[in-house]
Each structure stands twice: as C-alpha cells, then as structure tokens.
C-alpha cells in the first residue's frame, strides 16, 4: 500500500508540472484602460507555448457585449499562419496585430484613432491544443473637453453682483471647472462663490479690486481646455442727471409739437379768412351788361333815325359822335362808378345842326334798363 500511494503521488505531481508548463499568457499590468478619443491603444497579450502543445495555433480578439444575451463580436483573427483583420466593420482599417508574426508569442492588438463608440470589453483568446488561455481588457474611450466659452453676465458696477460662466459643449463626464485669476494679486475676490460642476463663479457685492483677467479650466481624466474673460468694475452712472436729461428732451419735444400744431392751425384759419373775403367782394360787384342787349339798342335806334327828322328840335337832345378809336371792351369791363353823373348841357336845335349833330330819338327806359 505504501508503494502504491507513492506512485500515485509521483504521477499527480508530473501531471501538475506539465499543466503548469503548458500554454500561458504572460502579460501583466492593468486590465482597465482609459484613453482619449483620437489616440491609439495597445492591448497587450504575450504568451508562451509548451512542448506538448502540438495543435494549430489560433488567436482571436473579440468584443464582449454589455448584454449577456447578445453574441460577442469577433474583431481580428490569426489562424493557419494568416491574419484576418476585417471581421468587425466599425474597426475596419483601424485594428491590426502588433507583431507581423503573432506565432512568435506576441498576440497583442493595436487600435488606431479611438472613438467613443470603441468603449467595451475586449478578450484575447489563444488556443493550441491541448493548451487554451485568455485575457480581458476593459477599454474606456473618453472625449476631451472642447474649447470652453467664457462670459460675464450682470451689471459691471460697484456694489452689484456679477456671474462668470464657463461651459464646454463636448467632454466625457465627470468634468469639472476651475476658475483662477491671472492678473493683479492672482487671488479670487473674498466674496466669490464657485461651482465646479456648472462652471459658474458669482462675484457678490463687486468692488473695483475685482477687476482683472480670469481664466477657466475645463478638465476631465483625459484632457484640459481653458478660456479667459476680462472683468471691469466701474462706478455706477449718475441716474439723476440721466432722468433730468430725459425729462428736458420730452418737454422740448412737446413744445415743438405744440408750435407745429399752432402754425398749422394759424395757416389754415388765414386761408379760410381769405376765401371768405373773396366771396364777399364778388357778391358786391353787379354783373356786367350784356353786349348783345347793347347792340340791339343801337340797332333799334338806327332803324328809327329816319323818323326823327320831322320831330321838333326842342324835343331832341344833343348827340355827340362816338369815338371809335377806343376799345369797347374797356367800357364794358370797367366797374361802375359811384360818382354822380353831371346832367348834359342843353343846346338849341339850330346850333346843333350847324355843329353837324345828328338828331336821334332816345327811347324811354324803365329802371332795369329795358326799352319801353
């Protein structure tokens, strides 16, 4: 029984020794890696083979799904002394083996131009029958903070509150904002309130000493970006003078409007008065005599000339020869005169005949000027 027990122990030790000296992955170090987008990463997978590993060498890198119910995605494969690097379309052209001949013991994988979508768990699996070994890496691709934008909000007067803001559009959380002063004594105002999460700094009851240049840094675990802002605290303006000036301007404007309205009303009243005077003048002037009626009166007088010769000279009035060199229109267009007309002088009939006068009969007329 003692010899049999000793034989079994020796056999067991030999088997354990052979197993320990078989296929092994010798890479060490962190299995959780954080990288910034745009960088490259090397997932190390060094291995050694045992003398009894006689089967074909197969190397496979795969992306483990976050959900256990999903299948893993094969990324890159080495089999039959050939490398196949186009299995996974999202990493196509950006992934390859670190060694041109992985069978020499280097199955490490390089990923170029990292993206945030490359985040995941990657597994290196090496198989050479009867040996099998694997190693996993948790890769986290983080986005650097984008260039932050600094701004100042609030009144820049002494005794007022001002808020300095800093914000990055892109960047993987957690991300914090740090404010510092780069001018003067480089110390923040004593009443400054910082918020590292939102990136705001409130300057309460600001004084002239708070004026200067301030810098904000946006940072996370993979990068840092910054921006600056100038702050100038001044004395508040004289509001009483501004109010007085506004009131004076309003009064001047009202006076100007009143003058314009007064001038318009005066001009309108004057024009209306002139029209009324013109209407009164036209009503006082009698209408001119008709030329047709005057011509008819001369015609009737001429037709009766022959019968006037037998009338006695005492019944005749003198008749002077009309002057034809004057324009008749002037006589008709001339307004009537209000001066009294002197009575015509009487002369004897024989004297009138010697003077060449022609006796005419003047028909009687009524008040409106018509012949009776």
Curated annotation (Swiss-Prot):
SMART domains: IG, IGc2, IGv. It comes from the Eukaryota. Glycans are attached at residue 205. Residues 291-317 have a biased composition (Polar residues). The chain crosses the membrane at residues 242-262. Residues 1-22 form the signal peptide. It is found in: Cell membrane; Basolateral cell membrane; Cell junction, Tight junction; Cell junction, Adherens junction. The keyword Signal applies. Residues 318-336 have a biased composition (Basic and acidic residues). PROSITE patterns: IG_LIKE. Its main location: membrane. Residues 23-140, 130-234 form the Ig-like C2-type domain. It is a single-pass type I membrane protein. One of its GO terms (molecular function) is virus receptor activity. The Ig-like C2-type 1 domain may mediate homodimerization. Monomer. Probably homodimer formed by 2 molecules on adjacent cells. May function as a homophilic cell adhesion molecule and be essential for tight junction integrity. May also be involved in transepithelial migration of leukocytes through adhesive interactions with jaml. The interaction between both receptors may also mediate the activation of gamma-delta T-cells, a subpopulation of T-cells residing in epithelia and involved in tissue homeostasis and repair. This is Coxsackievirus and adenovirus receptor homolog. The gene is cxadr.
